[in-house]
């Protein structure tokens, strides 16, 4: 064995002795180094020991006689854990000594201080005992953890008859890395709250609690399912309340595809055919019911007369012609009625003056040639006295309004007897709807001696009057729908062009236009009609339109080549100049398609195009 003096520690082995002259060598304890090696090698050689023990078990015989009679003692446990356990026990002993010393000090304090409350004493003792108990528990848990980790690292026993005299360590209170615990609560806090609420609801006994039993009978489902089916199409009368109803009624409703069979596709009718059908229809259709309705409306004549005598004007509206009704009321009933009433009043006053019937002036508003100056001249001849007509005004401007103002000032001081009945047919007519005409009539209605009886056909006729005109008229509205035909009113308009624009001319008007054009223009128009009819024939009967549209037109460049081939137009400029006449009379249209190419097409039906080819363009 070598002594400890023979081992010397060097700071630098490779250094020279000169460098280490001033350095004193350090002594190393070989026994302490051996202990450290022993601690580190215990874990390192663990697998080697386990393999050796397994080999020894295989080599040993299973004969029980060879086994030792006396039980072998457990080998000494090597390693660091014993030292750790000893240190922990020493700490526990120190803590117990400290607690005993603290208790002795408190007893001395109690003897010295006699004024301390009993409640504070007991509370302090409890706190101290709790602290010491917590410390003891923590130290015990540390000891148990240390022992379990140590036993896990120890090699297994090879001898079958080995019996350990040491008591088994208790299970650790806190789970370690090696220990497995199965008692885990995986319920989330939210689930725990829900379960607690359900438990409280289950335990609560309320008088209105719903209890279901086997005898529970559900509500029967109605058999008539049509009562509860919601209609796909909403009716016009059903809408929401409040402001939502406003938007619900005015929302855009997507309707089904429009029908191709519109009134524009209807065949054209000649004037002779129209007059024949309309005359027969107007005379015979619902003739007796219309007469009965007229007799019922006549019973309101006294009411109308009373309203006129009280200073009101009458305005009649409704479906049908009101011309015969107004003339019969004004001429046959109102004029003699007012005359006889005035005669009776004068007889009471014993005034022997001849009384003639009240004059009636009828204005035909449906006549476009009606002029307000001519109307005012007729009124002044009937109402204005001679002294007013002699003094002419020298003012520039509208003399009609100045003359009416003189009449208003004159008749303010006259008796309120009606001296003129002014009947206006179609107050919303094309000539009377002008502002000057409406202003003149509104000023005339201010005069109480003039009774105005008028009629309107358009539903928006009151929009012609502003606030001042409406106050001057002072109308009372009456509905007299009599469904009479407007035979006289329609004579001042072209019935065949009703519903069409003023500039457009039909196939009948195209005949007169073609007669006044040159032969070259007629050939060009005939070629256009023939190419369009060919395009209309190529389309199927279901999808093809019955009237010429952009879809059935001809490209301008292609049509230019066709005209050049037939020696009609040599270039595009000449072709455009020839087409200008047809475009102005709405006999042809030029538009651009989606690709930007110009298309020429004739806006007539297939039958009209055939008719033009057979009549006017047949000789070409």
Curated annotation (Swiss-Prot):
One of its GO terms (biological process) is silent mating-type cassette heterochromatin formation. It comes from the Eukaryota. The modification Phosphoserine is found at residue 188. GO terms for molecular function: chromatin binding; DNA replication origin binding. One of its GO terms (cellular component) is nucleus. It is found in: Nucleus. Residues 26-36, 83-101, 128-143 have a biased composition (Basic and acidic residues). Residues 13-23, 113-127, 145-166, 204-218 have a biased composition (Polar residues). Keywords: DNA replication, Nucleus, Phosphoprotein. Component of the origin recognition complex (ORC) that binds origins of replication. It has a role in both chromosomal replication and mating type transcriptional silencing. Binds to the ARS consensus sequence (ACS) of origins of replication. Present with 1700 molecules/cell in log phase SD medium. Belongs to the ORC2 family. This is Origin recognition complex subunit 2. It comes from Saccharomyces cerevisiae (strain ATCC 204508 / S288c). The gene is ORC2.
